[in-house]
Each structure stands twice: as structure tokens, then as C-alpha cells.
Swiss-Prot record:
SMART domains: YqgFc. It is found in: Cytoplasm. Could be a nuclease involved in processing of the 5'-end of pre-16S rRNA. PANTHER family: POLYNUCLEOTIDYL TRANSFERASE, RIBONUCLEASE H-LIKE SUPERFAMILY PROTEIN. It comes from the Bacteria. Pfam families: RuvX. Its EC number is 3.1.-.-. GO terms for cellular component: cytoplasm. This is Putative pre-16S rRNA nuclease. One of its GO terms (molecular function) is nuclease activity. CDD domains: YqgF (cd16964).
Length: 137
């Protein structure tokens, strides 16, 4: 059973995939989106679901530090609901607080340049989100 992890931003969606045993997450790609034009990357996500035989999707839910859900969190919830309807798959929301900061720290500790970090940060945040989900199931 493979699980897809998504870090949904305003301009990109970071994508990670689990191994078949559901133990580890690895980064796949970053999908460019344009919310204003209604381009959310659903076609590419659908392709990845088919390609990797995905059974479940985990979408990062950006909560405020006090646990409340703001406008960005509401947008992610709507994104997840649209995916659920489109793909007819189990879509789970996962608290992603500080996932981007954790990904940034991982990349800095690996001595990745600032330019390269900017290119892969969303994909790495998706890895952090998915690995957190896998570790707790």
C-alpha cells in the first residue's frame, strides 16, 4: 500500500511517496499551481496516483501555533475535499505545523545551497509530513 504525501502551498504542491510497506517517505517532485487561475495540479496528482498505485493521500494541514485553522488551512481542507471527490480515495489531513522549518533544517544540515533549498523545500516538507504520518500509524 503506497501513500502520497502533499504539502500544498499557494504556488506549488510538494509531493512525497511512501515505500510499498508504508515505512519510509521519499520526495518525488514539486508541482507548480496557480490558485487564481484554478490550476491546482489535480491532473498531475491523478497521474502519480495511477503510476504508483496509491491507496491513500495525506495532505498537510497548516494550523496556527494555537491549534486553530486559518485561511491557508481552510484552503488546504478544500483542496483535500476536491481530491477526495475527484480520485475517490481516502484523503487524510495531517498537522503540518513546522514541517517547512524541519525540512529547511534538514537541508541546511546536509549543506544544501540556498538556491537548491528553494527548489526542493516543498518536496522535502511533503516528506516530513508523510514521514510523520507513517511514524504514527
Amino acid at each position: 500500500m503506497r501513500i502520497l504525501g502533499l504539502d500544498v502551498g499557494t504556488k506549488t504542491v510538494g509531493v512525497a511517496i511512501s515505500d510499498e510497506m508504508g515505512w519510509t517517505a521519499q520526495g518525488l517532485e514539486t508541482i507548480k499551481i496557480n490558485e487564481e487561475r484554478g490550476h491546482f495540479g489535480f491532473d498531475r496528482i491523478s497521474e502519480l496516483v495511477k503510476q504508483y498505485n496509491v491507496d491513500k493521500i495525506v495532505v498537510g494541514l497548516p494550523k496556527n501555533m494555537n491549534g486553530t485553522i486559518g485561511p491557508r488551512g481552510e484552503a488546504c481542507q478544500q483542496f483535500a475535499e476536491n481530491l477526495r471527490e475527484l480520485l475517490q480515495l481516502d484523503v487524510v489531513m495531517w498537522d503540518e505545523r513546522l514541517s517547512t522549518m524541519a525540512a529547511e533544517r534538514l537541508l541546511i544540515s546536509a549543506d544544501v545551497s540556498r538556491k537548491k533549498r528553494k527548489q526542493v523545500i516543498d518536496k522535502m516538507a511533503a516528506v516530513v509530513i508523510l514521514q510523520g504520518f507513517l511514524d504514527r500509524k
